[in-house]
Amino acid sequence: MLQDRTGSRVPQVTFHTRSGHEWVDLTTDEIFAGKTVVVFSLPGAFTPTCSSSHVPRYNQLVPMFKEHGVDTVACVSVSVNDTFVMNEWQKTQHADDLLFIPDGNGEFTEGMGMLVEKDDLGFGKRSWRYSMLVRDGVVEKMFIEPEVEGDPYEVSDADTMLAHLAPNAPKPMDVSVFTRDGCPFCVMAKEALRNAGIDFEELVLNEDYTEQTLRAVANAVPQVEVNGELIGGSEAVEGWLKERASA
């Protein structure tokens, strides 16, 4: 039976981490004392949902969390993996702004009442998927995935946590910019977005996508897409930004 530990202190645990070529012990007091921390925990590094959805969205929303008073966003990928696995996973996720914490012995997870058996998958003991908001070592809110078969991912996501922390905060936009090297109009579009304070992901022709992909969208770069809607090239972006500013 999973435990909702809202109102309780987090377990006192020492995590054994690896930094460079040295072992570094990290205590829960060092992570949580006097700080506001968002924690999300998951079954395992490099697993599908964790790698494609859970970690990337928290990583994307780190600036939003910090804007609303969060000191640290921790993937206590208390996924019951060791520090070597967690360090490599962090690299592949390009998630330097997240704190990846290995709970190799499952002590923190067990203390949180979230340790479950995954023997049917050959995983052994793992963390159930959940997230929590912790202030000065005390759990203020937990979002625990329902106890159903499979790997539910309904309430522990970054957007749910952000909505709890800052209900009136505007939802961040998902912006992609398709570019190519040496394109001055691409530079203009990116600069316009930066000046408007809009974060975006850049996709470079022949590195991140092909001519065939571009032709499916348009005949030239740059192309800017926002929340699934194609805005267009640099002039269209300027017009969209002006319209947005006057709204």
UniProtKB/Swiss-Prot annotation:
Enzyme Commission number(s) of this protein: 1.11.1.17
Domain (Glutaredoxin): residue spans on this chain: 163-247
Sections of the chain in a coiled coil: none
GO BP annotation list: cell redox homeostasis; cellular response to oxidative stress; hydrogen peroxide catabolic process
Domain Thioredoxin: 4-170
Keyword Isomerase among UniProt keywords: no
Cited function: Catalyzes the oxidation of glutathione amide (GASH) to produce glutathione amide disulfide (GASSAG). May play a role in GASH metabolism under anaerobic conditions as a sulfide carrier necessary for cytoplasmic sulfide oxidation.
Protein name: Glutathione amide-dependent peroxidase
Organism: Marichromatium gracile
